[in-house]
């Protein structure tokens, strides 16, 4: 799995992606990271990558010609790469989308800055626009890291226990509550069913709690599980 990241702040990477499970997988060669400095494709001595928007308005936009040269260089080396632009205007990034992206094998993530990028870049190169949520952050780098982390976890060999992926939130509803030692802490005890060692009862309890939590917090997710959106259980 190859991720090409186009950014004006290449030193931000790998950042958090260099730690824990995803970082170990990077060092083992289970996925690779190719960070491309957009400024290196600027044509002036100041390495200018932005300009004022036509029609006026606040802020600056990243220039189409500079971005175009940067993207072309990546496409020359990786002609089959999937182009993704992290943008608050994009479609909401989900676990299902993460699964789909992994199948491409080679992904190029364009990280916007300032007020965004010249729209012609999205149109000419047919970028898939992806948003990590209904909020605005300073740039696309953190969003790109979220996308990469989510995708890398599903690469074969990255997560040792495959059941961990199958039981996570959003696979089909939200994840059930989990507990570890001590059995009692600050007057709160672990549910008895988890202490009895009956695997069937444990699974039934987990399914029930997953359903209850999903109904209360994210009923929209139940549509993908063949459930109803309305109603919640207080049992």
From Swiss-Prot:
Key words of the record: Cytoplasm, Methyltransferase, S-adenosyl-L-methionine, Transferase, tRNA processing
EC number: 2.1.1.228
Residues reported to bind S-adenosyl-L-methionine: 112, 132-137
Record InterPro entries: Alpha/beta_knot_MTases (IPR029028), tRNA_m1G_MeTrfase_C_sf (IPR023148), tRNA_m1G_MeTrfase_TrmD (IPR002649), tRNA_m1G_MTases_N (IPR029026), tRNA_MeTrfase_TRMD/TRM10 (IPR016009)
UniProt-annotated location(s): Cytoplasm
GO molecular function: tRNA (guanine(37)-N1)-methyltransferase activity
Bilayer-crossing regions: none
One Pfam family linked to the record: tRNA_m1G_MT
BP GO annotations: tRNA N1-guanine methylation
PANTHER family: TRNA (GUANINE-N(1)-)-METHYLTRANSFERASE
Family, as annotated: Belongs to the RNA methyltransferase TrmD family.
UniProt protein name: tRNA (guanine-N(1)-)-methyltransferase
Record organism: Anaplasma marginale (strain St. Maries)
């Amino acid at each position: 799995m190859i991720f090409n990241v186009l950014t004006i702040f290449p030193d931000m990477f790998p950042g958090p992606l260099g730690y824990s499970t995803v970082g170990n997988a990077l060092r083992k060669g289970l996925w690779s990271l190719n960070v491309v400095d957009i400024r290196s494709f600027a044509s002036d001595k100041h390495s200018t990558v932005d300009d004022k928007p036509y029609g006026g308005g606040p802020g600056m936009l990243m220039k189409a010609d500079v971005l175009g040269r940067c993207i072309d260089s990546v496409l020359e080396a990786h002609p089959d790469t999937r182009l993704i632009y992290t943008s608050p205007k994009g479609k909401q990034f989900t676990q299902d989308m993460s699964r789909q992206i992994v199948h491409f094998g080679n992904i190029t993530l364009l990280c916007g800055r300032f007020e965004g990028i010249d729209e012609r870049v999205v149109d000419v190169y047919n970028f898939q626009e992806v948003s990590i949520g209904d909020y605005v952050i300073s740039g696309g780098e953190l969003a790109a890291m979220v996308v990469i982390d989510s995708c890398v976890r599903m690469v074969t060999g990255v997560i040792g226990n495959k059941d961990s992926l199958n039981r996570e939130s959003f696979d089909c509803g939200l994840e059930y509550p989990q507990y570890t030692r001590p059995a009692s802490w600050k007057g709160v005890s672990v549910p008895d069913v988890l202490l009895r060692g009956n695997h069937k009862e444990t699974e039934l309890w987990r399914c029930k709690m997953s359903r209850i939590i999903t109904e209360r917090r994210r009923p929209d997710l139940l549509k993908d599980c063949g459930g109803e959106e309305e109603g919640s259980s207080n049992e």
